[in-house]
């Protein structure tokens, strides 16, 4: 299928709006029509090339929410029409940590996060010349449609506005972790926030 996307072809240069070919979801993947995507400071850092990744060309954006259009083989917990938040972490499901119930420390997560590929080592986007265009953190929310791992697509209630839901994929979790886990802020305490995002 065709999808319009903002493609990064050089660090620090404007994104080009391109029509890409998007492959159908493979096993344990979903096709999502993106409704809203936030622009995190991590997206700006990546756009500048400050992460040192070799993933160009790439469709960026990792804070998105949308509606499931199709599911690949093996997907049982999502169906077309479900509202989802796309998460930038997709544990592999088969390493020792994952099978032990500790997918939050998946052994394959960090290497695959910076690869520009999905869990099977390939990308689903192709440009007009048939060349692969990489994914950003499994999400690539700066596209009308995305294919991502089902494990990285979290169902949310239909009544939750998707323009707010997209923030759950990164900034809410990051902010929550900083406040609750790191700073251990207690009810009634005051805090100051100097900046958010990567």
Language-model features and meaning:
Residues 21-37, 50-99, 104, 112, ...:
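Glycine-rich beta-strand-centered segment in the early N-terminal region that forms part
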Residues 7-14:
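Extracellular beta-rich ligand/substrate-recognition surface
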Residues 2-4:
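Extreme N-terminal starter segment of soluble prokaryotic enzymes
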Residues 144, 151-153, 157-198:
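Mid-domain Rossmann-like dinucleotide-binding core that forms the NAD(H)/NADP(H) cofactor-binding site
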Residues 42-48:
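Cytochrome P450 core scaffold surrounding the K-helix E-X-X-R motif
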Residues 42, 85-89, 170:
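Glycine-rich phosphate/pyrophosphate-binding beta-alpha loops
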Residues 87-151:
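Cysteine-cluster motifs in flexible loop/terminal segments that predominantly coordinate metals
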